[in-house]
């Protein structure tokens, strides 16, 4: 009867086997292959375009820009977002597969920027529409800052638990406050009060009736006499 013999492990076997968890393997594969969907609407996006060149070379981080949201797991918003563009941004985010991430790049995307001071159509922060993972302030941020934001996102992905990241699809989070308009009477009726437009000088002795009875240009000598 043959006895059971256990195989003898070679010394090099220990160096060939990696013990890890499925969660760590999933995080490692995702952080090394981020496929961004570029949503640029203003000047901040020009700084991100500098990363494509050989000086910064963002391909070394595994970034492959995609034109379809169904093939992307990262959306990078750069520039001003208006109320009219908000539903389109939310729709693009909802079409992305889970897990998905968002980087808000620039002051206009984070807070609305200088365009939100007296504007009724500017969204004051893209986080009112979609959840943001990394905020990148600046006007505009430098390409080095964009690389730092991507590095921070990669560290966040490496620490997260895949089961907790997947969440049910949320409804429309678009900021849809109804605007109330009140009809007021226009002050521009075409009839102007000439006494308010051309008030006579307080030191002049010319009466108002004398000042406005001349419809055609007259000389100052005729006006006084």
Curated annotation (Swiss-Prot):
GO biological process, one term: aerobic respiration
NCBIfam families found in the cross-reference section: nuoB_fam (TIGR01957), PRK06411.1 (NF005012)
PROSITE patterns according to UniProt: COMPLEX1_20K
Originating gene: ndhK
Molecular-function GO term, any one: 4 iron, 4 sulfur cluster binding
Cofactor: how bound: Binds 1 [4Fe-4S] cluster.
UniProtKB keywords: 4Fe-4S, Chloroplast, Iron, Iron-sulfur, Membrane, Metal-binding, NAD, NADP, Plastid, Plastoquinone, Quinone, Thylakoid, Translocase, Transport
Protein name, as recorded: NAD(P)H-quinone oxidoreductase subunit K, chloroplastic
Family the UniProt entry places it in: Belongs to the complex I 20 kDa subunit family.
Species the sequence originates in: Olimarabidopsis pumila (Dwarf rocket)
Membrane topology qualifier: Peripheral membrane protein
Function: NDH shuttles electrons from NAD(P)H:plastoquinone, via FMN and iron-sulfur (Fe-S) centers, to quinones in the photosynthetic chain and possibly in a chloroplast respiratory chain. The immediate electron acceptor for the enzyme in this species is believed to be plastoquinone. Couples the redox reaction to proton translocation, and thus conserves the redox energy in a proton gradient.
EC code: 7.1.1.-
HAMAP family: NDH1_NuoB (MF_01356)
Residues that bind [4Fe-4S] cluster: 43-44, 108, 139
Subunit relationships: NDH is composed of at least 16 different subunits, 5 of which are encoded in the nucleus.
Cofactor(s) demanded: [4Fe-4S] cluster
GO cellular component: chloroplast thylakoid membrane; respiratory chain complex I
Compartments (UniProt record): Plastid, Chloroplast thylakoid membrane
Catalysed transformations (reactions): a plastoquinone + NADH + (n+1) H(+)(in) = a plastoquinol + NAD(+) + n H(+)(out); a plastoquinone + NADPH + (n+1) H(+)(in) = a plastoquinol + NADP(+) + n H(+)(out)
InterPro entries in UniProt: NADH_UbQ_OxRdtase-like_20kDa, NADH_UQ_OxRdtase_20Kd_su
Pfam families: Oxidored_q6
Primary location class: plastid
